[in-house]
């Protein structure tokens, strides 16, 4: 223990074995031991006594749109990673679209990595994209270290990232399965969307009718059938429709290699509360009714849904018009995801251990980051320090993402992130940040 540089002591440390008083020893950016709370601090080590604040593993958010380069007026690595650090997130994986260029070739990946290199306050990895015409690029991107490949089954909203039809989905899936990769999918069926009423305007009920549950359900059913046929590993992005849960549970029981995520906005906001014209609540698939939300929480509890991620997808404020048909669809959630989920999870009888499992352990496992997602010896010393009983009212002016539009404005949330640590260095404390210390991550072989 003579090489220990730092000891973080708390009466509540969340480990894979549960929550207990402990002292966490850190050396060279790694956790070296989880010791009894009253363990003697090694000579030369610095002690950080956190009192009763909870020490939890840094969160791993595998669904973030940073939009850099190309649409940095929407977001960027500097602002997105500061917002993440403010929310206790220590690792994010950036989506391949909304940046220019999209991450669909090795050259484009290199461009994005070059841009991110000196701007990342936390660790950053990258997804690749699966397009109708880039099957030849998938294996090279895999070899270059992307964590998997995103595909849309309906229009993405940006011209440079077209969707896959069923034939091209099968072709891309077969290619990715052939080298053991992961395909992650925005699952809404374009035919059901085209058949739905498209009234436009400010009424949220009209927007909700334009993105029906059966669009998700059909797309997911088709995805699961293809995955079963090809023995492919697939991941359903941002599940909103609870009607798809029996399909997913059945596929898992049959051994289909599928994982599923949902998002804080689906778990904490409801269609009934969305004011007309309030497009800060717009996302696709949409926020649905309270009864639907109850079923999503049940699915999290029973394991049908694996994890919770933000789908942070910002834009400039002028794109959030009062017409739901034309307003940009995306919710910015990096900074508020932990308190938003904790507030609702606690109300429903869940523990912080559950939240850590959904937002850190399982997300790290999804992308194969064996050094992340838990407080145990050998892992990266990435932590969030949370005061779970403290409350705050969301003030958009206090948010760190570039365009301070939020669906949570004025809401009172529980859980204040006091500090965030990356490889044993405190990168955020009480809203103050160090210079960027994040690294760019590649898929571990």
Swiss-Prot record:
InterPro entries, from UniProt?
A: Allantoinase (IPR017593), Allantoinase_bact (IPR047604), Amidohydro-rel (IPR006680), DHOase/Allantoinase_Hydrolase (IPR050138), Metal-dep_hydrolase_composite (IPR011059), Metal_Hydrolase (IPR032466)
Q: What GO MF terms are annotated?
A: allantoinase activity; cobalt ion binding; zinc ion binding
Cofactor names from the entry are: Zn(2+)
Residue positions annotated to bind Zn(2+) 1 are 63, 65, 150, 311
Cellular compartments per GO CC: cytoplasm
Q: In which pathway does it act?
A: Nitrogen metabolism; (S)-allantoin degradation; allantoate from (S)-allantoin: step 1/1
Lineage of producing organism: Bacteria, Bacillati, Actinomycetota, Actinomycetes, Kitasatosporales
Q: Looking at its record, which EC class is this enzyme?
A: hydrolase
Chemical reaction(s) catalysed: (S)-allantoin + H2O = allantoate + H(+)
Residues binding Zn(2+) 2 are: 150, 186, 238
Task: Relay the cofactor remark from the entry.
Answer: Binds 2 Zn(2+) ions per subunit.
Annotated GO biological processes are: allantoin catabolic process; purine nucleobase catabolic process
Q: What does this protein do?
A: Catalyzes the conversion of allantoin (5-ureidohydantoin) to allantoic acid by hydrolytic cleavage of the five-member hydantoin ring.
Please report which protein family the annotation says this sequence is part of. Belongs to the metallo-dependent hydrolases superfamily. Allantoinase family.
PTM summary from the entry reads:
Carboxylation allows a single lysine to coordinate two zinc ions.
Task: Give the enzyme's EC designation.
Answer: 3.5.2.5
List modified residues, type N6-carboxylysine.
150
Name-wise, this protein is Allantoinase
Q: Which HAMAP family match?
A: Hydantoinase
Q: What's one Pfam family the UniProt record gives for this protein?
A: Amidohydro_1
Which ranges does the record mark as transmembrane? none
Q: How does it assemble?
A: Homotetramer.
Q: What's in the keyword line of the UniProt record?
A: Hydrolase, Metal-binding, Purine metabolism, Zinc
């Amino acid at each position: 223990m003579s090489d220990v540089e730092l000891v973080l002591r708390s009466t509540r440390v969340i480990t894979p074995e549960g929550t207990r008083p402990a002292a966490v020893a850190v050396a060279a950016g790694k956790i070296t031991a989880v010791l009894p709370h009253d363990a003697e601090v090694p000579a030369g080590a610095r002690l950080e006594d956190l009192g009763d604040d909870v020490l939890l593993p840094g969160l791993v958010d595998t669904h973030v749109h940073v939009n850099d380069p190309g649409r940095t007026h929407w977001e960027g690595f500097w602002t997105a990673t500061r917002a993440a650090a403010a929310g206790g997130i220590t690792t994010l994986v950036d989506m391949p679209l909304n940046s220019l260029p999209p991450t669909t070739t090795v050259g484009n990946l290199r461009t994005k990595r070059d841009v991110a290199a000196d701007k990342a306050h936390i660790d950053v990895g990258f997804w690749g994209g699966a397009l109708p015409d880039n099957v030849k690029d998938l294996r090279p991107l895999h070899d270059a270290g992307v964590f998997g490949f995103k595909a849309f089954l309906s229009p993405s909203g940006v011209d440079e990232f077209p969707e896959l039809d069923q034939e091209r989905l099968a072709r891309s899936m077969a290619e990715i399965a052939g080298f053991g990769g992961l395909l992650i999918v925005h699952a809404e069926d374009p035919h059901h969307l085209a058949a739905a009423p498209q009234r436009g305007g400010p009424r949220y009920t009209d927007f909700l009718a334009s993105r029906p549950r059966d669009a998700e359900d059909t797309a997911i059913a088709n995805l699961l059938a293809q995955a079963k046929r090809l023995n492919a590993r697939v991941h359903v992005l941002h599940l909103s429709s609870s009607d798809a849960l029996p399909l997913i549970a059945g596929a898992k029981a049959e051994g289909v290699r599928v994982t599923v995520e949902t998002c804080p906005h689906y778990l904490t906001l409801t269609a009934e509360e969305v004011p007309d014209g309030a497009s800060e609540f717009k996302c696709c698939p949409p926020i649905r009714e309270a009864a639907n939300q109850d079923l999503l929480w049940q699915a999290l509890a029973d394991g049908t849904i694996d994890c919770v991620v933000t789908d942070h997808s910002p834009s400039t404020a002028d794109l959030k018009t009062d017409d739901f048909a034309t307003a940009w669809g995306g919710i910015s959630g990096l900074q508020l995801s932990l308190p938003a989920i904790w507030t609702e999870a606690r109300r429903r009888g869940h523990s912080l251990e559950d939240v850590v499992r959904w937002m850190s352990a399982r997300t790290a496992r999804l992308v194969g980051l064996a050094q992340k997602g838990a407080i145990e010896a050998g892992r990266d010393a990435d932590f969030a320090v949370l005061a779970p009983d403290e409350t705050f009212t969301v003030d958009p002016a206090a948010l760190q993402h570039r365009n301070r539009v939020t669906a949570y404005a004025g809401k009172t949330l529980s859980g204040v992130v006091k500090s965030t640590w990356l490889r044993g260095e405190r990168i955020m404390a009480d809203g103050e940040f160090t210079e960027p210390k994040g690294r760019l991550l590649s898929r571990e072989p």
